[in-house]
Amino acid sequence: MTNIRKSHPLAKIINESFIDLPAPSNISAWWNFGSLLGICLIIQILTGLFLAMHYTSDTMTAFSSVTHICRDVNYGWIIRYMHANGASMFFICLFMHVGRGLYYGSYTFTETWNIGILLMFTVMATAFMGYVLPWGQMSFWGATVITNLLSAIPYIGTSLVEWIWGGFSVDKATLTRFFAFHFILPFIISALAAVHLLFLHETGSNNPSGVMSNSDKIPFHPYYTTKDILGLLILILMLMLLVLFSPDLLGDPDNYIPANPLNTPPHIKPEWYFLFAYAILRSIPNKLGGVLALVLSILILAIIPLLHTSKQRSMMFRPLSQCLFWLLVADLLTLTWIGGQPVEHPFITIGQLASILYFSIFLILMPISGIIENRLLKW
């Protein structure tokens, strides 16, 4: 009798994806973030589902329904803060995952990489809409500022913004539709993640050395399942430390003030994970130019496979490219800091320089370093 794990149609899919999957024998902890993102998505869907049972998407009651969840619902406070801080953990894992892909040349799997970029856009859209739902000051003004950016699109901009708003300002219709989209998008993300995995399993995983590992594979279970469980424990520990000791550390105090269209907060800023893109947006004085730079700050990832000039896939043995990679990390941290600062001197200049450096690293410096390293190999 054949093992049910290998014969049953459903069990066979799970077996080939998580149990008998041939995996490279040398993949490091940087390969843990894919599974951690899956765990984050499950946590977000479950906590979000329970929050949706008590939340009301109406401008009059949204803020008080969130207060009600925290005060009156059994363990509502922990569900709410796990959801809010779970989003932060999600983005930490996402940035690490993308950084790993950049460092080790995983972007040469173009289909997997491009679906990953699509996933990133979808996750960012979901997080943005989720931030609007508590209907605090920063929720309302964040929604107003970010949706207003679409008015920079020539000819159709203004109509498009009013169509998204469902009126002439961010109001009840906007909140209701944002809640509907915020609810459905995680399931679309799940489907995209399955396609992401499907394409990944067509080629097999990359590994730190960047060379083919077909001659040296090990089964995913028990080796990498055990390793992933360790990653999961660390993730849960970090999330619960955040939730139980400083749940509002990454939030904005302005969001504890109910939304008021007549009173603008002194500094409108998005959640921390969007600050780098927000800084790039603000560094360009022209509205349309800023919006284009904002979109390109993520979309630039799509052309990275075309700009790969090195004969080696991974940066493991490429010191010049390694320096540029860590310069990029430092630049992103600088942009994140600038995004949270007021628009005044010297922050404007620092933001503009950091934005120029961000695009220069991808478009000019990385390809040049690849060519130089190829030359050095001939010596």
UniProtKB/Swiss-Prot annotation:
<dbReference type="GO" id="GO:0046872">
    <property type="term" value="F:metal ion binding"/>
</dbReference>
<keyword id="KW-1133">Transmembrane helix</keyword>
<dbReference type="GO" id="GO:0008121">
    <property type="term" value="F:ubiquinol-cytochrome-c reductase activity"/>
</dbReference>
<dbReference type="InterPro" id="IPR005797">
    <property type="entry name" value="Cyt_b/b6_N"/>
</dbReference>
<comment type="function">
    <text>Component of the ubiquinol-cytochrome c reductase complex (complex III or cytochrome b-c1 complex) that is part of the mitochondrial respiratory chain. The b-c1 complex mediates electron transfer from ubiquinol to cytochrome c. Contributes to the generation of a proton gradient across the mitochondrial membrane that is then used for ATP synthesis.</text>
</comment>
<dbReference type="Pfam" id="PF00033">
    <property type="entry name" value="Cytochrome_B"/>
</dbReference>
<feature type="binding site" description="axial binding residue">
    <location>
        <position position="196"/>
    </location>
    <ligand>
        <name>heme b b566</name>
    </ligand>
</feature>
<feature type="transmembrane region" description="Helical">
    <location>
        <begin position="178"/>
        <end position="198"/>
    </location>
</feature>
<dbReference type="InterPro" id="IPR036150">
    <property type="entry name" value="Cyt_b/b6_C_sf"/>
</dbReference>
<keyword id="KW-0813">Transport</keyword>
<feature type="binding site" description="axial binding residue">
    <location>
        <position position="182"/>
    </location>
    <ligand>
        <name>heme b b562</name>
    </ligand>
</feature>
<dbReference type="GO" id="GO:0045275">
    <property type="term" value="C:respiratory chain complex III"/>
</dbReference>
<dbReference type="InterPro" id="IPR048260">
    <property type="entry name" value="Cytochrome_b_C_euk/bac"/>
</dbReference>
<feature type="binding site">
    <location>
        <position position="201"/>
    </location>
    <ligand>
        <name>a ubiquinone</name>
    </ligand>
</feature>
<feature type="transmembrane region" description="Helical">
    <location>
        <begin position="113"/>
        <end position="133"/>
    </location>
</feature>
<dbReference type="GO" id="GO:0006122">
    <property type="term" value="P:mitochondrial electron transport, ubiquinol to cytochrome c"/>
</dbReference>
<dbReference type="InterPro" id="IPR048259">
    <property type="entry name" value="Cytochrome_b_N_euk/bac"/>
</dbReference>
<feature type="transmembrane region" description="Helical">
    <location>
        <begin position="347"/>
        <end position="367"/>
    </location>
</feature>
<feature type="transmembrane region" description="Helical">
    <location>
        <begin position="77"/>
        <end position="98"/>
    </location>
</feature>
<keyword id="KW-0472">Membrane</keyword>
<dbReference type="Pfam" id="PF00032">
    <property type="entry name" value="Cytochrom_B_C"/>
</dbReference>
<feature type="transmembrane region" description="Helical">
    <location>
        <begin position="33"/>
        <end position="53"/>
    </location>
</feature>
<keyword id="KW-0496">Mitochondrion</keyword>
<feature type="binding site" description="axial binding residue">
    <location>
        <position position="97"/>
    </location>
    <ligand>
        <name>heme b b566</name>
    </ligand>
</feature>
<keyword id="KW-0349">Heme</keyword>
<keyword id="KW-0830">Ubiquinone</keyword>
<comment type="similarity">
    <text>Belongs to the cytochrome b family.</text>
</comment>
<protein>
    <recommendedName>
        <fullName>Cytochrome b</fullName>
    </recommendedName>
</protein>
<comment type="subunit">
    <text>The cytochrome bc1 complex contains 11 subunits: 3 respiratory subunits (MT-CYB, CYC1 and UQCRFS1), 2 core proteins (UQCRC1 and UQCRC2) and 6 low-molecular weight proteins (UQCRH/QCR6, UQCRB/QCR7, UQCRQ/QCR8, UQCR10/QCR9, UQCR11/QCR10 and a cleavage product of UQCRFS1). This cytochrome bc1 complex then forms a dimer.</text>
</comment>
<feature type="transmembrane region" description="Helical">
    <location>
        <begin position="288"/>
        <end position="308"/>
    </location>
</feature>
<feature type="binding site" description="axial binding residue">
    <location>
        <position position="83"/>
    </location>
    <ligand>
        <name>heme b b562</name>
    </ligand>
</feature>
<dbReference type="InterPro" id="IPR027387">
    <property type="entry name" value="Cytb/b6-like_sf"/>
</dbReference>
<keyword id="KW-0999">Mitochondrion inner membrane</keyword>
<keyword id="KW-0249">Electron transport</keyword>
<keyword id="KW-0479">Metal-binding</keyword>
<feature type="transmembrane region" description="Helical">
    <location>
        <begin position="226"/>
        <end position="246"/>
    </location>
</feature>
<feature type="transmembrane region" description="Helical">
    <location>
        <begin position="320"/>
        <end position="340"/>
    </location>
</feature>
<keyword id="KW-0812">Transmembrane</keyword>
<keyword id="KW-0679">Respiratory chain</keyword>
<keyword id="KW-0408">Iron</keyword>
<dbReference type="InterPro" id="IPR030689">
    <property type="entry name" value="Cytochrome_b"/>
</dbReference>
<dbReference type="GO" id="GO:0005743">
    <property type="term" value="C:mitochondrial inner membrane"/>
</dbReference>
